[in-house]
């Protein structure tokens, strides 16, 4: 079935998914005209985001932010980057490019909704990794590495399964409510705050 194929592919690619610590997160700003960007990078640099109403990025405005040292994983140091974009207009299609690890990343798309009337999705407690100690339908014991980042497969099964279900829930919710402006997750987002693999699954 399509679902079993999706699950098989998720398991096969989980090592790659869970070690991708550089996803970009977008969150609402202080008001409707602002948008916050946050991401990890491996390079000490000034974080930048370029934004334009043109897909080819003509006339783009560049915003800079702040960077701090975040975590070290497998001897690799990661930096936390935060940038706020301002001056956004309602009901407008934008294109943006994040500057990460010394290069501009692929251009992405973002559309603002009406400022005075909008809807959003509210979810709670994805808590990636919380299924630890349970036994899966495939008779696997769900283990969790706690506040430790490890590549050992048997220590990441809880995060793997929870992330898969979380992604499915989000995709289905957004398919059913494609007009929402944003999503609010009340938390807990992950089971262990220092386990970056759980965050990778949450953001993936």
What does each of the following model-derived ranges do?
Residues 4-204:
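Divalent metal-dependent phosphoesterase catalytic cores across multiple superfamilies
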């Amino acid at each position: 079935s399509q679902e079993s194929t999706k699950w098989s592919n998720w398991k096969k690619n989980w090592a790659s998914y869970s070690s991708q610590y550089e996803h970009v997160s977008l969150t609402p700003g202080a008001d409707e005209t602002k948008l916050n960007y946050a991401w990890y990078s491996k390079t000490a640099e000034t974080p930048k985001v370029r934004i334009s109403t043109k897909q080819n990025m003509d006339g783009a405005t560049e915003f800079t932010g702040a960077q701090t040292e975040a975590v070290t994983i497998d001897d690799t140091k990661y930096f936390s980057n935060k940038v706020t974009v301002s001056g956004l207009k309602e009901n407008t299609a934008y294109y943006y490019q994040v500057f990460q690890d010394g290069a501009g990343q692929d251009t992405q798309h973002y559309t603002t909704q009406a400022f005075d009337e909008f809807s959003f999705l509210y979810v709670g407690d994805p808590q990636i990794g919380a299924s630890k100690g349970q036994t899966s339908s495939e008779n696997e014991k769900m283990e969790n590495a706690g506040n430790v980042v490890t590549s050992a497969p048997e220590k990441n099964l809880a995060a793997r399964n929870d992330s898969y279900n979380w992604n499915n829930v989000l995709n289905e919710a957004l398919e059913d409510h494609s007009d929402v402006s944003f999503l609010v997750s009340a938390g807990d987002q992950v089971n262990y705050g220092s386990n970056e693999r759980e965050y990778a699954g949450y953001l993936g």
